[in-house]
């Protein structure tokens, strides 16, 4: 009997070694770029059947203080992480002779690696001379002390239920807002998402906070900002790990967030600018960063009179259709979404026991604000389907390059100017020109960027 048990132990050990060897063969280590600075592996990226978009955040959290790429790194350096197993569905079967073997499942890194930016050491971009009290993101006067901070880039959901219930908070106080298609779906759940940039104002409430997408590693480095978000697919998280930015994933930074448990998962995760900045200071990540910013001018340009801009055509999702209407009295564009209904932002104070799923408690009277912008900029760029599975509905991530050059439409002061955008690297701001190649200046104030596919047709009036 003892002999039989011993043979069983030896056999089981042998099988275990074979399984481990097979797993190692399926997951080759990534080849770091020459400028990367390796460090000891930290907590592995959690795997799940779907990203935060499909299910609420897990309550099974790692110990506070564990990190997912949250260490601030100089531009040109990043920290590769060990590969993790993939929950992505297997690749389609290989085409060819009948009976040919199916292709091996694509790993997280195999799906994500083609979209990894070539971060390197670039010469510092000279910051234009401007008064210390002029916000480089808006061109407006601001408290100089507020400008000596790291910008926050918050991922904010835009599902129809969020707008219907007036759950948006903080958008009206952002300096910049980017709106983009988040996924390519063949079902009715497609929508857009916002990346809102906060520097000169500190909203008491920001939300609802949602998951990150691969577009974020292209916009956050130019701001040297901190990305405020909640989870994402394994492929997206791996890409964030290779990117020089402050990563404030809610999963690993629970004390910076709270929950309004009266809402569904699409609207319940919230934060405040004050709390995020307290968390940055505790971690030693808050600092003044040089921002090149945009060019601004009070002088209205010559252009085609346009008072209404609407995004209603496919592939823009029906649930996210939006119109901007020029208001001559204020000199701003008012946002309507869904069409015909003002898109409202709610401003109200909040108290919370931060972290570990703590409840958000709002205090005081809600103040609703109609979202507006001094500039609406439409950027045209490629939208490429990827193999990165983003949620349990098998929606795939969209690669939207924001470097290079492309067409642009600039709307300010009730006119449209056709032009171009250009950007050499992820660390640089966009440069805007009109159709004649002359620099184009934005109107001082808030700018909303609508990022659309090449050839997308706007509805203009």
Identify the function of each model-found stretch:
Residues 2-12:
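Bacterial N-terminal signal peptides that target proteins for export
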Residues 3-4, 24, 259, 361:
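Secreted/luminal cysteine- and crosslink-motif detector
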Residues 12-13, 87:
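A periodicity- and composition-biased signal for non-globular, repetitive helical segments
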Residues 23-130:
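Ser/Thr-rich, Proline-interspersed low-complexity disordered segments
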Residues 106-178, 185-461:
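A surface/extracellular/periplasmic glyco- and lipid-processing/surface-interacting theme
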